Amino acid sequence: MLKTAFENLRSRSPLIHNITNYVTVNDCANMVLACGASPIMADDAAEVEEITAICGGLNINIGTLNSRTVTSMLLAGKKANQLGHPWCWIRWVPVLPVCAPTPPSVCCGRCSSQ
């Protein structure tokens, strides 16, 4: 099943919007590329809704939060929900209250991040 999912992903090569932190931006872009998709890293609140609208999915990594990126994350998450795009919060346990108004379709976390 996972093999089929990756084959489907690679055949479509979707553009994936990533709002990540400064520590992992390169790693996140490389992971998206390794899965067969194309990353775009955009976190300015003035553009995130437009960027999310042209992408096939949204990845939000909240490793180092700040007020600017939190605003961008919430705007992008709401837009992804409106469009029915899949999206994912990484390191979600500390921010469950933030996720409540914009529920993600996928949540990821590591034991070391909890």
Residue ranges and their predicted role:
Residues 22, 45, 93:
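Residue-level "edge-of-site" marker
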Residues 1-41:
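Glycine-rich phosphate/adenosyl-contacting loop at the front of the ribokinase-like
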Residues 48-114:
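Glycine-rich phosphate/dinucleotide-binding loop and adjoining beta-alpha-beta core of small-molecule
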Residues 40-49:
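Active-site-flanking structural segment that lines cofactor/substrate pockets
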